[in-house]
């Protein structure tokens, strides 16, 4: 019967959706734990820790030394280019200045060459990919 088939398909999609959400929650927890080791305070930069822009910035600047080692203009450009939603140069500049202050005040437990810095970057990439896949699944259901 067609109704049973549709119901089955929807139920399986919802089940898979929940599995992906659970995986994302696990990744978010791991990312936050690692950030406390590699770049304490970075999570204060954005109101939404797991927005794509926040994840892009955290992926590029996984350690405060990476912020402090580049000049302000390069930092502003990285932030400006880290979202596809469009951001004003003024807002990018504001974020860059905030990020600099956070980096100066941050006391990480590991240095920039620690494996934890690389691990953090990989987990952020996994989370971004998972968010993208979930969006594709949701779009396919509509």
Predicted region positions:
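A detector of single, family-specific signature residues
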Residues: 1-142
């Amino acid at each position: 019967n067609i109704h049973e088939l549709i119901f089955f398909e929807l139920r399986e999609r919802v089940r898979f959706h929940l599995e992906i959400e659970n995986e994302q929650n696990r990744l978010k927890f791991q990312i936050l734990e690692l950030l406390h080791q590699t770049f304490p305070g970075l999570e204060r930069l954005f109101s939404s820790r797991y927005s794509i822009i926040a994840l892009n910035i955290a992926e590029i600047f996984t350690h405060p030394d990476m912020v402090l080692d580049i000049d302000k203009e390069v930092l502003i450009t990285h932030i400006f280019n880290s979202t596809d939603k469009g951001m004003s140069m003024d807002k990018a500049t504001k974020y860059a200045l905030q990020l600099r202050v956070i980096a100066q005040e941050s006391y990480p437990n590991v240095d920039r060459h620690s494996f934890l810095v690389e691990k953090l970057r990989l987990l952020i990439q996994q989370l971004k990919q998972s968010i993208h896949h979930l969006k594709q699944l949701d779009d396919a259901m509509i």
